[in-house]
Amino acid sequence: MAENLKRLVSNETLRTLQEKLDFWLKEYNTNTCDQNLNHCLELIEQVAKVQGQLFGILTAAAQEGGRNDGVETIKSRLLPWLEASFTAASLGKSVDSKVPSLQDTFDRERHKDPSPRDRDMQQLDSNLNSTRSQCNQVQDDLVETEKNLEESKNRSAISLLAAEEEINQLKKQLKSLQAQEDARHRNTDQRSSENRRSEPWSLEERKREQWNSLKQNADQQDTEAMSDYKKQLRNLKEEIAVLSAEKSALQGRSSRSRSPSPAPRSRSCSRSRSASPSTAVKVRRPSPNRSKLSNVARKAALLSRFSDSYSQARLDAQCLLRRCIDKAETVQRIIYIATVEAFHVAKMAFRHFKIHVRKSLTPSYVGSNDFENAVLDYVICHLDLYDSQSSVNDVIRAMNVNPKISFPPVVDFCLLSDFIQEICCIAFAMQALEPPLDIAYGADGEVFNDCKYRRSYDSDFTAPLVLYHVWPALMENDCVIMKGEAVTRRGAFWNSVRSVSRCRSRSLSPICPRSQIGLNTMSRSRSPSPIRCGLPRF
């Protein structure tokens, strides 16, 4: 801008303009009309050039001021002058310096109300101050929280050390008591053998009565001592179990404070079931590590197993079924129905198991307030008592009478025993969570829900209805924590209705000839009996 101003001053345009005005004034009366007009137009052109340069300088100066600076000056000086100039030019009057009505209007408005920019600046300042105060408060809270966390860590470490020391002392006491009991038994045996050798043969009958009385007294003393010893031993074991549980809880709390991600619990390999939970209550002691395992860790482990079942076990089951069934839709329907039935059977088994445990533990917890907690802890610690094979048989029985997949009988559902057993175990363990996990209800022909399911690769992505489901969605109360998979097609509702009607029409004859699969050409009756694994299928 300074260069343009220097250039304007160095041109001396205004000085030559004044000289031309003086010359025109002297020659005005002697000139003709055309000459006067030419002089006037020449002066107007020169003034326009100067005015253009001045407007360029004005533009550069306004740009240097930024986005907001200079706005008030342009409103108060330039706009009123332009208004007066255009008004005078349109009316044919001379420009009067007292005309600027817009300037007066802007001055009145400026004195009446503050500008929006000032109000915005004040609002921004107030917001900035409040934000700073909030930031300071958050920083103070963060410092205080760090102090509290450090104190809790120190207390947990001290409690852990004290618990370990007490456990070691109790173990030493238990060993000493066992050694004393063994020594007492050895002394008793030695005394009895010495008394037997010292008896004279002539007084055998008379001493026999005394020996019997002494033996009865010794047996009574031995039984009393054994009962006392068993009570002490039981108390010591209970104290060790409680302290071990506290130790594992403190270790879990310290590990969670160091790393928030829970470690998944290893899957129990034992699937055997004892005769009844009442005998298990008397014989087996619940493992403290498993009973105190956090709900979050068990939930994470079960979600991982459920995801592995979808990504690996489901595909393995599909490979087994594709050897017998060529249609992919039928294979996927069978696996989905097997999963749904497995969850249903596992939930029923969990209810019966919990009722049985509650009845077995009732005499031991008369008048206790933590009865439900004891029942839940026992169920969590003894999930391996679940009879998964019985549930597998129930699932296969339900699949045999399902009208969507049971006819025609082209495959034996016992092929899916391993898959069904894994799903039953996962569903049974999910019922022990707080809150329990369950699968979402799904029906063919329903409206596709993007929150619950994802479409399969061969779906019609513009279809609004579900043709059939591939995998169920996992729910926690009413919240979806793991999406399922569904196939969507146009006209899915009518296709599902026609398929159901065809299946029900075929269900009138449950015995139909078996298709040619491998070497077996036998016909099979579709009875509800779940024992079908003995028949060869390939």
Curated annotation (Swiss-Prot):
Region Interaction with YWHAG/14-3-3 protein gamma: start-end pairs: 1-273
Gene induction: By p53/TP53 and p63/TP63. Directly activated by p53/TP53.
Residue ranges, compositional bias (Low complexity): 253-278
Compartments, as annotated in UniProt: Cytoplasm, Cytosol; Mitochondrion outer membrane; Mitochondrion matrix
Alphabetic keyword roster: Coiled coil, Cytoplasm, Lipid-binding, Membrane, Mitochondrion, Mitochondrion outer membrane, Phosphoprotein
Phosphoserine found at: S85, S156, S159, S287, S509
Region ranges (Disordered): 97-137, 173-226, 247-294
GO biological process: mitochondrial protein catabolic process; mitophagy by internal vacuole formation; positive regulation of cardiolipin metabolic process
InterPro entries referenced in this protein's UniProt entry, alphabetically: MIEAP, MIEAP_C
Transcription regulation among keywords: no
Ranges of compositional bias, category Polar residues: 123-137, 211-224
UniProt KW Cytoplasm keyword: yes
Comp. bias (Basic and acidic residues): 105-122, 181-210
A Pfam family annotated for this UniProt entry: MIEAP
Principal localisation: cytoplasm
Protein family according to the UniProt entry: Belongs to the MIEAP family.
Binding partners and assembly: Interacts (via coiled-coil domains) with BNIP3L (via BH3 domain). Interacts (via coiled-coil domains) with BNIP3 (via BH3 domain).
Name of the protein this chain belongs to: Mitochondria-eating protein
